[in-house]
Design a protein with these regions (language model features):
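Active-site cofactor/cluster-binding pocket
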Residues: 2-218
């Protein structure tokens, strides 16, 4: 919580919508004001989507899920692993997992029996140091943007709509830094990994203009 998950997921959902897809999102909130495991589900299809659906095909584990008070330098509960551990059960056979190896210790990942479960379910796992990439570009919070770049590459999406949304929301050095890490992460994934998974972004086309709104605003 507090790591930009909401804005990152909303922009990714809008990019899918602008590419011609129908979108349905669901936001899970932790039961406390600051900190705790939070996640967003995005369902996208080339036909009308009216519900969340069951399970998902792609898991991007971001953030550290800490409950913390920076002023007191206090941390309430070590929950780094939750973005990965608490969402595995709903990942479908043949699904894709991207997690930030720069945030998670090998021992924590090993306790999940991820390797064995991946083999049993034909999951395709990509441990990528998103945190390290973000630090190289000057701001650790941009690991989310790096994650989006990797995700877009693995789904064989074009970056055009994502870049347009960033340009609408940012400016100056912040925009340039985010565009840079987005493109670098995208190209890194294309160059360094073999795409043996079958999960790809669907294709679609809208007959009329679309808008993405929350249930409250609707």
């Amino acid at each position: 919580s507090g790591d930009g998950i909401d804005s990152t997921s909303q922009n990714f959902a809008k990019a899918l919508m602008r590419s011609g897809l129908d979108i349905f999102t669901h936001r899970h909130y932790p039961s406390r004001i600051r900190g705790g495991h939070t996640y967003v589900e995005i369902r996208a299809a080339g036909h009308e989507v009216q519900s969340r659906g069951d399970g998902y095909n792609f898991l991007l584990a971001l953030g550290d899920s800490f409950a913390r008070n920076p002023k007191e330098e206090a941390v309430y509960g070590d929950e780094e692993i939750k973005p990965l551990s608490e969402n595995l059960d709903e990942l479908r056979e043949g699904g894709v997992i991207v997690y930030d190896s720069g945030l998670l210790e090998d021992d924590d990942v090993a306790e999940l029996n991820l390797e064995e479960r991946a083999e049993e379910n034909d999951w395709h796992v990509f441990p990528i140091d998103l945190r390290g990439m973000a630090k190289e570009h000057g701001r650790e919070v941009m690991r989310n943007t790096a994650g989006v770049g990797v995700t877009a590459a693995l789904l064989e999406m074009d970056l055009e709509h994502i870049e347009d949304l960033m340009t609408d929301a940012m400016s100056g050095d912040v925009l340039e830094a985010n565009l840079s890490i987005l493109r670098d992460a995208y190209e890194m994934a294309q160059e360094e990994y073999e795409f043996e998974h079958e999960v790809r972004a669907p294709t679609g086309e809208h007959d009329e203009e679309q808008v993405l709104v929350s249930g409250s605003n609707a």
